[in-house]
Amino acid sequence: MTETVTDQGKQRSSKLQKNEAAKDEQVEGKGKETLESGTDKSAEQNSSLLVGQPDVIDNDNVQTVDDFKNLMYKMQETRRAIVFALLNEKDLTKDDVEILKRAYEKLTDNQTHSFQREMCTLTTKLSVNIGDETRGLEKDLKYLDALMNIRREEPNLLWPIIMSRVDLFSILANYHPKGKETFLKEYEDTVKFLKTFISSEAITGKKPIFITDWDGTMKDYCSQYATNLQPVYSAVGMTRFAASFTRISAVLTAGPLRGPGILDLTAMPIDGPVMFSGSWGREWWLSGKRVVHQDGITDEGFNALQRLDDEMKDLLHTSDYAPFALVGSGVQRKVDRLTLGVQTVCHHVTSELSNRYQMAVKERMHRVDPNSQILVFDPSTELEVEVVAHNSGIIWNKGNGVERLIKSLGDSLQSPGKILICGDTLSDIPMVRQAVKQNPDGVLAIFVGAKMSLREEVKQVIGDESRCCFVSCPDVIHAAMSQILNEHCIGK
């Protein structure tokens, strides 16, 4: 087993990972939507991405796919600036908030109906579900408006005091998929649960460890992975919670670090108290460098994947296949594979177009690997395919990612001290198992939106139902973290 440290731009890759847990996360992460009260649910469930027949079209007044992505990424840069200001006692600029308002106005103009936004490429019109992007901005604007109102009334107050006076629960409760009453019950239970987690420092003398999945756990699912962007309120709360109450906090996701990946999509400081990983913990961003665990990966496999990634960028920018950049997983360059979205949850890409796209992918694979000795085309689910580099048979899961992080940091999961693992699918169970193996009585787990079978598995692995907590959506956790921080601030 080897570990390499490289600059951000350099990448490695790895093995054929036929892992049911990983598949579980990929299937659920495709375009699953968290539906909230007050929205047109039927429209969202029946629409995701509608791709028209290729033809030369009139693009007047219709936003292009590239324009949409550029709008969202520039808006996310502004979110990061706002988060930085709030965390470092800087003034918020009116311009920054206005940028978010203008982005929201753009997303809700007459090109959008019931969260379906009409867009185009050079030859194709399409309709994209932007419900998650819109709601995230809506919640942020309410949150920032509350902060700014208090700041105007009492300009000498520090941001933590101002934040403690904002009722985040009331802002988020209306968006809970099961209503306010359920939100309140889950919120109260989660506040108590998190208090148990952070109180362990007083008993053991060590701050606890917090490790979490991302999509579906700390961030609502989005129809487009490429624009699954973290809101301000979430970024501020997670960063402050990690800094105040934990000695290690980490996000461990199946997606990549870059390209886009978690480092592009988060609004948290990437070199702050929360660390980030991609590819099931095969790649980490630590101390400003990309750390890659390349077990079983050959140089030939890495090079072939890198060349295919370049081929895919060319394919999406110079053909009728541009819409596939926004189909589910889009194009994700992971350590050992490329994950490619080929269909939406609601099957709004025609079979003919999806098949043509997959044939185009195979043709690009042949350019890179003409003898089919390095790359494997794996139609892993009906929603996505994977192009995987041949490997030495090593099976990697998120538990391995946790193990490598702790080893890299020179720390331990063993007692004394508590560990909180958060997830939402079977692919997150290996993180729980890894922690329980090292610290049987010190592991707590929060799982989001889990089916009964998954809940039972979590309880069985933990071995103590009182150390398990289940909620319906990520916002419950964010509201609970906010309350813990508010009480901590008032206590000071």
UniProtKB/Swiss-Prot annotation:
<feature type="binding site">
    <location>
        <begin position="332"/>
        <end position="334"/>
    </location>
    <ligand>
        <name>substrate</name>
    </ligand>
</feature>
<dbReference type="GO" id="GO:1901136">
    <property type="term" value="P:carbohydrate derivative catabolic process"/>
</dbReference>
<feature type="active site" description="Proton donor/acceptor">
    <location>
        <position position="215"/>
    </location>
</feature>
<feature type="binding site">
    <location>
        <position position="215"/>
    </location>
    <ligand>
        <name>Mg(2+)</name>
    </ligand>
</feature>
<dbReference type="GO" id="GO:0004805">
    <property type="term" value="F:trehalose-phosphatase activity"/>
</dbReference>
<feature type="binding site">
    <location>
        <position position="213"/>
    </location>
    <ligand>
        <name>Mg(2+)</name>
    </ligand>
</feature>
<dbReference type="GO" id="GO:0016311">
    <property type="term" value="P:dephosphorylation"/>
</dbReference>
<dbReference type="InterPro" id="IPR049063">
    <property type="entry name" value="T6PP_C"/>
</dbReference>
<dbReference type="GO" id="GO:0005992">
    <property type="term" value="P:trehalose biosynthetic process"/>
</dbReference>
<feature type="region of interest" description="Disordered">
    <location>
        <begin position="1"/>
        <end position="55"/>
    </location>
</feature>
<dbReference type="Pfam" id="PF18572">
    <property type="entry name" value="T6PP_N"/>
</dbReference>
<keyword id="KW-0460">Magnesium</keyword>
<keyword id="KW-0479">Metal-binding</keyword>
<dbReference type="Pfam" id="PF21141">
    <property type="entry name" value="T6PP_C"/>
</dbReference>
<comment type="function">
    <text>Catalyzes the hydrolysis of trehalose 6-phosphate to trehalose and phosphate; prevents the accumulation of toxic levels of trehalose 6-phosphate.</text>
</comment>
<feature type="binding site">
    <location>
        <position position="424"/>
    </location>
    <ligand>
        <name>Mg(2+)</name>
    </ligand>
</feature>
<comment type="similarity">
    <text>Belongs to the gob-1 trehalose phosphatase family.</text>
</comment>
<dbReference type="InterPro" id="IPR041064">
    <property type="entry name" value="T6PP_helical"/>
</dbReference>
<protein>
    <recommendedName>
        <fullName>Trehalose-phosphatase</fullName>
        <ecNumber>3.1.3.12</ecNumber>
    </recommendedName>
</protein>
<dbReference type="InterPro" id="IPR036412">
    <property type="entry name" value="HAD-like_sf"/>
</dbReference>
<keyword id="KW-0378">Hydrolase</keyword>
<dbReference type="GO" id="GO:0005737">
    <property type="term" value="C:cytoplasm"/>
</dbReference>
<feature type="compositionally biased region" description="Basic and acidic residues">
    <location>
        <begin position="17"/>
        <end position="43"/>
    </location>
</feature>
<dbReference type="GO" id="GO:0000287">
    <property type="term" value="F:magnesium ion binding"/>
</dbReference>
<dbReference type="InterPro" id="IPR023214">
    <property type="entry name" value="HAD_sf"/>
</dbReference>
